[in-house]
Amino acid sequence: IVFGDWSSDVCSSDLVDVGASTGGFTDCLLQLGAKKVYAVDVGYGILHWKLRNDPRVVVMERTNARNIEAFPDSIDLVTVDASFISLKILLPVIKGWLSRKSQVIALIKPQFEAGRKDAAKGAGVIRDHEVHKKILEEVLSYALNERFDIKGLIQSPLKGPKGNIEFLCHLTFSDENGTIEEKFNHLNESINLTLENLM
């Protein structure tokens, strides 16, 4: 399962899957023992029928995550697999759903984070590792400033459309341990290590 060691707190929790699509993350969360998953997507009729009929899944189709102020349950973890939008837009919204030490596992998709110039160079495929580094620095620095701590960063085992390299990050909200300088130093170490191991 893609979450690996990041999945320890999923069991018996209420979770949100932003950009649920056919339900890849939703299915993983249920297999790990999630009590309830809110499957949020702007599309309609995409979620797999098995998940659509699972009583643990709350189907929220035709729903833009940016318009959700809160959920009726205390949310322990949010997964994000969103396209055509930057995490820098979604994180402030997601932050409003969370309590202290809630978690976020999000895909960072360089093709949707890069500026038009960088995205246009490869017809939507980001191959330049310097661009990857710049995007990771921008997105994760933004997360730090939004009071998230960075607990993990890896290359996603699955590539995006057209072979785009994507990254999985593990964030916790408002842990408040360590100075901001220490957190930025740790961020830089994590980014460099991840990029060294790109496949």
Where are these regions (language model features)?
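Short alpha-helix
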Residues: H132-E146
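Conserved class I S-adenosyl-L-methionine
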Residues: S13-S21
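A short glycine-rich, Lys/Arg-flanked "PGG" loop and its adjoining helix->strand segment in the class I
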Residues: K88-I105
